[in-house]
Amino acid sequence: MKSAMTSSPLRVAIIGAGQVADKVHASYYCTRNDLELVAVCDSRLSQAQALAEKYGNASVWDDPQAMLLAVKPDVVSVCSPNRFHYEHTLMALEAGCHVMCEKPPAMTPEQAREMCDTARKLGKVLAYDFHHRFALDTQQLREQVTNGVLGEIYVTTARALRRCGVPGWGVFTNKELQGGGPLIDIGIHMLDAAMYVLGFPAVKSVNAHSFQKIGTQKSCGQFGEWDPATYSVEDSLFGTIEFHNGGILWLETSFALNIREQSIMNVSFCGDKAGATLFPAHIYTDNNGELMTLMQREIADDNRHLRSMEAFINHVQGKPVMIADAEQGYIIQQLVAALYQSAETGTRVEL
């Protein structure tokens, strides 16, 4: 699955030259002497040119297939709009590249399954940038859960909520290109973090409700302006995931919701021995009525993007490190699809 260490730098290409390609992928790659950013591709050639110039002398392309054939990179970051993750990831894998793909993995579970199977068949690393699981908080809490400190966890609550945060840039309000709204954009992050800490328990069923009450009525928020006439994603979604072990995960996510807080991105866990919150990581319990804190981080770790990218490259180089792998990406894609299906049909979805 992994390439051997070599003396020459790994050649890296980026498909999709938007904000995340700049702030996360290119900025990280250019900090390492064992990596060389050799190509940037975007259908908007001027966008690719700007990113390439910012980080050196990478060649610029508007056709990913032509770029892959000509440049022959070792590693590709897929940062294109969600609709193209499947196409661009398969293209890169079949060109012999290891791939770091932005979330979500794809638009459907079937696509995510094919991406996973293709990577396995070709012996290439496919990872997804579910970076919240790489926070020190998440890593420490996962260790404590594995060691049984919380006991049997029977209720988990994952919240990715914005009060007035519809993105006014990109394609975030376009369901055809994005696949959905807050669930597939920010809710998916807390869903992955929760599932990771829980150890990816087997899912029995999913039940959800979604709402579109604000985005089609307003046109401006704290994250910019949008056109309410073309707003086609949900404002908010609420769902319950039931596990075969008897536990449940309650998920809340929104771009726009009339709550007091401007933003909430957190997960809480209730076990029969102790409870915990994730950001920052706290574990708490009681001893015959005496409230006790068993673990407490004062400030949540902010280097999670860096740790995610670092883990991917180290894994490609053959180091035994954890990544958000293709199989887990498929499971998360299944859950997202089931939540949307349940919300759209008004019925429980069995998995």
UniProtKB/Swiss-Prot annotation:
Protein's recorded name: D-glucoside 3-dehydrogenase
Pfam families, per database record: GFO_IDH_MocA, GFO_IDH_MocA_C
Family affiliation: Belongs to the Gfo/Idh/MocA family.
SUPFAM superfamilies: Glyceraldehyde-3-phosphate dehydrogenase-like, C-terminal domain, NAD(P)-binding Rossmann-fold domains
Disulfide bonds: none
Family annotation (InterPro entries): Gfo/Idh/MocA-like_OxRdtase_C, Gfo/Idh/MocA-like_OxRdtase_N, Gfo/Idh/MocA_Oxidoreductase, NAD(P)-bd_dom_sf
Catalysis: reaction(s): a D-glucoside + NAD(+) = a 3-dehydro-D-glucoside + NADH + H(+)
Record GO terms (molecular function): nucleotide binding; oxidoreductase activity, acting on the CH-OH group of donors, NAD or NADP as acceptor
Natural source organism: Escherichia coli (strain K12)
Its EC number(s): 1.1.1.-
UniProt cross-references to PANTHER family, sorted A to Z: D-GLUCOSIDE 3-DEHYDROGENASE, UDP-N-ACETYL-2-AMINO-2-DEOXY-D-GLUCURONATE OXIDASE
Record keywords, A-Z: Carbohydrate metabolism, NAD, Oxidoreductase
Statement: the UniProt record of this protein carries the keyword Metal-binding: no
Role according to the record: Catalyzes the NADH-dependent reduction of the oxo group at C3 of 3-dehydro-D-glucosides leading to D-glucosides. Probably functions in a metabolic pathway that transforms D-gulosides to D-glucosides. Can use 3-dehydro-D-glucose, methyl alpha-3-dehydro-D-glucoside and methyl beta-3-dehydro-D-glucoside as substrates in vitro. However, the actual specific physiological substrates for this metabolic pathway are unknown. To a lesser extent, is also able to catalyze the reverse reactions, i.e.
